[in-house]
């Protein structure tokens, strides 16, 4: 596990306002610590591992650690990151958030895959206004970021259909049983990664505080129910 050496700043964008950190490998990461809630960290870890297993162009990520010595030296406003293990997403250079005008340049298969994955993990947080997709114009490539809102217990299928940045591509799947079968087979290849990620969660993430006397607000059984939709015939259900 990589140690965080320096906490440089805090991002202004994003609901969780991740910290910008330098790790011992000399690379810069956007880091979500205790401030982001355990559920957010867990969703990032599980969602990221599943996306990676599917071959989606997810930004590289790591488990990073804020050591005791570093933590004690932090100013008060930076201590919100907390001590211990955090989720870190490697900072990406030379890219910007995907703009609506660039959507036609994105391969349709990639659009379908990203939308189908978000539907699978119940992630509504990829919209025109907040795509959570980085775009490199020089080579017309995408980078997928942010799975902290995956496994949403308040997921609204109709909102997803209306607001997802690749909603048009997703509707193609719903209207074509061959595409649905292809997507189901593809999505099932993420199940081993799901189980492995769940089985290898940091033990401290079971607690909402550093004292480890307040259980984290995270329900593994609800996450399992979300994933089981692919086996019980309800994956594409709108109701």
Can you say where each PLM-predicted feature lies in the sequence?
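Conserved kinase catalytic-core segment
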Residues: 93-156
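Short, surface-exposed, polar/charged, turn-prone segments marking secondary-structure boundaries
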Residues: 57-61, 69, 115-119, 143, ...
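Short, low-complexity, polar/charged sequence segments that are solvent-exposed and flexible
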Residues: 48-53, 79, 105-111, 161-166
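C-terminal catalytic region of ATP-dependent kinase domains
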Residues: 142-239
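A general structural signal for short secondary-structure boundary/capping elements
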Residues: 65-67, 130-137, 180-182, 188-194
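A short, terminal or domain-edge coil/loop segment
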Residues: 10-14, 110-124, 179-189
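Short, structured coil/loop segments at alpha-helix boundaries
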Residues: 67-79, 97-99, 104-108, 136, ...
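Conserved ATP-binding subdomain of kinase catalytic cores across diverse folds
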Residues: 1-100, 120-124, 150
